[in-house]
UniProtKB/Swiss-Prot annotation:
GO terms for cellular component: extracellular region. This is Conotoxin LiC42. Keywords: Disulfide bond, Knottin, Neurotoxin, Secreted, Signal, Toxin. It comes from Conus lividus (Livid cone). It is found in: Secreted. The lineage of its organism: Eukaryota, Metazoa, Spiralia, Lophotrochozoa, Mollusca.
Amino acid sequence: MKLTCVLIIAVLFLTASQLITADYSRDKQEYGAERLRDAMGKFKGSRSCGHSGAGCYTRPCCPGLHCSGGHAGGLCV
């Protein structure tokens, strides 16, 4: 009986803390889409030019590098 009461109180406490936290953070992400877009720009796959050793089939090599092996499967060197 005591264990059941302790479990019920623990569940009520955790539920209340989740509801309080959810209500507090509701308006905190006003510019979430902008932050996501800025973070996506930092990924390796979204760079505008191919760095040394990168493939040059889908994007051009960065300045100072050239495509070795042709555009059908070459690498930026």
